[in-house]
């Protein structure tokens, strides 16, 4: 399926042009607000003690870099992955952690790269309902799920749009529940966050 190379750590999908332009016009940038996929452990997830915040390895990295730059950062829960993307696209949030680089996303966001992490995307299936998988074509004729507005790279996204029945759901738990209930044949998601 490929690696989420520029994806997860295109990690600093940042409205950098906005930041650069705003910093020059309004003075030094002193605080950033970031968000991301709240179902992405060990990288990002909602803090059970404070559900309005995200925690994880990505938050630790963002805070360390922000501290080195002398900028404050707050990493908030802005809703499911699709809403988090919309919050950045509309400028209500400054930075999006964990987006895969695609041409449509480049129209509204700048990506800082190279990525600091690659995480493999995999095809999850129900035990006892396995099927041979060697290429994208093996997914044809089956129904799959992933998160709304999730991307696995521009080439796969185009292939899926033209050849696959791939539905979007709002949460990973919903995708896996549909898989367990045999309402879908597979789930596309990254290996470590999906475990």
Question: Which sequence ranges carry the predicted segments?
Answer:
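A ligand-binding cleft/hinge motif common to bilobed small-molecule-binding domains
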Residues: 82, 89, 99-108, 155-158, ...
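Ligand-binding cleft/hinge of the Venus flytrap
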Residues: 45-50, 62-71, 114-116, 136-140, ...
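N-terminal secretory signal peptides that target proteins for export/translocation
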Residues: 1-6
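Sec/Tat signal peptide C-region and signal peptidase I cleavage site
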Residues: 21-25
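Flexible hinge/capping segments at coil-to-helix
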Residues: 125-144
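Extracytoplasmic small-molecule ligand-binding "clamshell" domains
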Residues: 26-100, 107-108, 168-169
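Short, hydrophobic alpha-helical packing/hinge segments within bilobed ligand-binding/sensory domains
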Residues: 61-62, 83-87, 175-178, 184, ...
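Bacterial N-terminal signal peptides
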Residues: 9-20
